[in-house]
Amino acid sequence: MFCTSFPRPRCPQYSNPINVKISQFGIEFIRGFGEAMAPYFPGEATPSLGFRDHGYLYCVSPEGADAARARVEMQRSLGAHTVYLDQGALKDRFPWLNVEDLAGGSWGSKDEGWFDSMGLLNGFRRAARAEGVEYIDNAVTGLEVEDDRVTSVKLSTGEVVSCGTLVNAAGPRAQQVAAMTGLSIPVMPHKRYSFVFASETPVPGRMPNVIDLSGTFVRPEGELFLTGNTPLDDGPADFDDFAIRHDEFEDRIWPALWHRIPAFDALRVMQSWCGHYEYNMLDHNGIVGFHPQIRNFMFANGFSGHGLQQSPAVGRAVSELILYGAFQTLDLTPFRYERIAANEPFLEEAVI
């Protein structure tokens, strides 16, 4: 996995109602983060997540217009502030956008944007330590299973830690951890390349995160811009392969950017990196819950690129399962592990 100081996304524009609800809880959590963290920062400024409420703008093709309108209607029925803009309204709202090949776009006009991931991580870490959590900088190399429980965890240094409940939150390495107990889940690392660039011509106004028909996205990052896409060779990668392909920007991303936003005719890449999505190859949705046979082994895996924005709701759900044995607030039963074993996808279409 990779961490970056660049703000990460928060968006309720999903095709599945439960994912919309998860993101709505995330928005509420992010907005109240400073207040929630205040007890753990006595006499100090609480961490600011710098939420940029600019929204996401999904470009919509003529053949995709009906489905896009239906998604917007569903999202709005749940209280989201998504709006569908036809071609003319889209051009009026974002005059710098090339709309000639678009039917329109769906835009989150409120409570949608991106935030500082490291601020979230550091706040969680500070609060957890204050509550008695011990962080161990080590690697898990083995799990001891007796009867129907994981009893201990072996670390690379040879230490052994006894286990009450094991939560597999290993991101792209989730399958490696599952395999230590003889289990298997369809979660593998998929490479994603990110590029930060400068443009000679600025984009005026409050620019959203634009998701092009090609799958390329771009959003402002201060005076710069962050972009990425889904590579053509989007297959499982080696767990330690973080080599970046710079030609992905030259050959695919830049042409897509220039077509959609003509102001991007002269760009200069300032920074780039490669990270891994923990990609659930069954249905692009997370796996949350206990294994039915190894009863203290819990999954929190496979979020396929939207894990950070779903982490507040999923973390709450994991704690509810551990404390109460059932979901108490948002019912995440559709994410249960049993669908994996039965090969029954719970599909999410809005994955970039």
Predicted regions and their residues:
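Helical element adjacent to the flavin cofactor pocket in flavoenzyme catalytic cores
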Residues: 101, 106-165
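Short beta-strand to alpha-helix junction loop
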Residues: 21-24, 58-67, 107-126, 241-249
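Dinucleotide-binding Rossmann-like beta1-alpha1 core, especially the glycine-rich loop
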Residues: 2-93, 215-217, 257
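Mid-domain beta-loop-alpha active-site segment that forms a flexible
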Residues: 105-127, 171-173, 249-256, 303, ...
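C-terminal catalytic lobe of FAD-dependent flavoproteins
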Residues: 117, 255-352
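Central helical "cap/lid" subdomain
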Residues: 157-206
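A short coil-to-beta-strand element that immediately follows conserved catalytic motifs
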Residues: 51-53, 135-137, 186-192, 262-274, ...
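Active-site lid/adjacent beta-loop-alpha segment flanking the redox-cofactor pocket in flavoenzymes
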Residues: 199-296
